[in-house]
C-alpha cells in the first residue's frame, strides 16, 4: 500500500479499545480502521483466542489487519498467515497444570458471590482464562458482576491468593475484560507479540487497561512502545486522528 508511514506500526487492544466490552465492532469504527490502515501498518493484540476476536472484529479479521495477535501474540498472524504459536500445556506440564486447575476450581466452589453460571476455566493455547462467575453468563449478568467486582474486588483477591500459592511456577495473573483474568507464564503478556515486530522502530499501542495488573500494562510500559491510554472506541478514533491522520494530512 502506498502512502504509509514507513517503520511505524500501530497496535490496538480489542475490548474497550476497538469495541465495547465483548461487543462487535461498529461499522463506523471498522471503516475508520480501514482508513487508518491506508496511512500506517495496523495490528491487533488481544488476550482472547482467535474465535472470540473474530466474533468481535469479524470473520475476516486476519486479512483486515496487517498483524493479528490472539492470546497476547502466542498465536500470531501476519497478512492472513499463521507465523507463530506457543503452548501453555507443554510449557507447564500436565501435573502442574492439573494442580493449578484443581486449586482454582476449589477456590471458586467456596466463593460466595450473588450468581454463578458455567465455564469457570477456559483452556486456551497459551493461557488459562479464569472467570469466578463463569463465562456462560448473559451480558446483563456480566455487567452486574463487573459492578459487583469493582466494590468487592473478587478478581483481585483471587489473583492475590493464586499468585502466592503458585509463585514457584513463575506465572503472571492479568485481569482483563469484565468477568475474568488470564494466567500464563511470565513474559507471555502482550509484550510477547513484539518479537514479531523487529522491523518497526516505532510501535504505538492503544489500550484501556494500562494500569498495573491490567492486561495492557506490560506492553503499555514497554521501552519498545509509545503507550496511549483510551477510554472507549470513540476515544481511540479521536486519538488516532490526532496522532496519525492529522499528521499525514499536514505532511501531504
UniProtKB/Swiss-Prot annotation:
Keywords: Cytoplasm, Isomerase, Magnesium, Metal-binding. It catalyses: alpha-D-mannose 1-phosphate = D-mannose 6-phosphate. Mg(2+) 1 binds at residues 13, 15, 208. Mg(2+) 2 binds at residues 220, 225. Pathway: Nucleotide-sugar biosynthesis; GDP-alpha-D-mannose biosynthesis; alpha-D-mannose 1-phosphate from D-fructose 6-phosphate: step 2/2. Homodimer. Expressed in roots, leaves, stems and flowers. Alpha-D-mannose 1-phosphate binds at residues 22, 124, 135, 142, 180, 182. It is found in: Cytoplasm. One of its GO terms (biological process) is GDP-mannose biosynthetic process. GO terms for cellular component: cytosol. The lineage of its organism: Eukaryota, Viridiplantae, Streptophyta, Embryophyta, Tracheophyta. Its cofactor is Mg(2+). InterPro entries: HAD-like_sf (IPR036412), HAD-SF_hydro_IIB (IPR006379), HAD_sf (IPR023214), PMM (IPR005002), PMM_cap (IPR043169). Overexpression of Dendrobium officinale PMM in Arabidopsis increases total leaf ascorbate and polysaccharide content, and increases seed germination rate under osmotic and salt stresses. GO terms for molecular function: metal ion binding; phosphomannomutase activity. Its EC number is 5.4.2.8. It is an enzyme of class 5 (isomerase). Signal peptide: none annotated. This is Phosphomannomutase.
Amino acid at each position: 500500500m502506498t502512502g504509509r508511514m514507513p517503520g511505524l506500526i500501530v497496535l490496538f487492544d480489542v475490548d474497550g479499545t476497538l469495541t465495547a466490552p465483548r461487543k462487535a465492532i461498529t461499522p463506523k469504527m471498522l471503516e475508520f480502521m480501514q482508513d487508518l490502515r491506508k496511512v500506517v501498518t495496523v495490528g491487533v493484540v488481544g488476550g482472547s483466542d482467535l474465535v472470540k476476536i473474530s466474533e468481535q472484529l469479524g470473520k475476516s479479521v486476519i486479512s483486515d489487519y496487517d498483524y493479528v495477535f490472539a492470546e497476547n501474540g502466542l498465536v500470531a498472524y501476519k497478512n492472513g498467515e499463521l507465523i507463530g504459536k506457543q503452548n501453555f500445556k507443554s510449557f507447564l506440564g500436565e501435573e502442574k497444570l492439573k494442580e493449578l486447575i484443581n486449586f482454582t476450581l476449589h477456590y471458586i466452589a467456596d466463593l460466595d458471590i450473588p450468581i454463578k453460571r458455567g465455564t469457570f476455566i477456559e483452556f486456551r493455547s497459551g493461557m488459562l482464562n479464569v472467570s469466578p462467575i463463569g463465562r456462560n453468563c448473559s451480558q446483563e449478568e456480566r455487567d452486574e458482576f463487573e459492578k459487583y467486582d469493582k466494590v468487592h474486588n473478587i478478581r483481585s483477591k483471587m489473583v492475590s491468593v493464586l499468585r502466592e500459592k503458585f509463585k514457584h511456577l513463575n506465572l503472571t495473573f492479568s485481569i482483563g475484560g469484565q468477568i475474568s483474568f488470564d494466567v500464563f507464564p511470565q513474559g507471555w503478556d502482550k509484550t510477547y507479540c513484539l518479537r514479531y515486530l523487529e522491523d518497526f522502530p516505532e510501535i504505538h499501542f492503544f489500550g484501556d487497561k494500562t494500569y498495573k495488573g491490567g492486561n495492557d500494562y506490560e506492553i503499555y510500559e514497554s521501552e519498545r512502545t509509545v503507550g496511549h491510554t483510551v477510554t472507549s472506541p470513540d476515544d481511540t478514533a479521536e486519538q488516532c486522528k490526532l496522532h496519525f491522520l492529522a499528521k499525514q494530512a499536514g505532511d501531504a
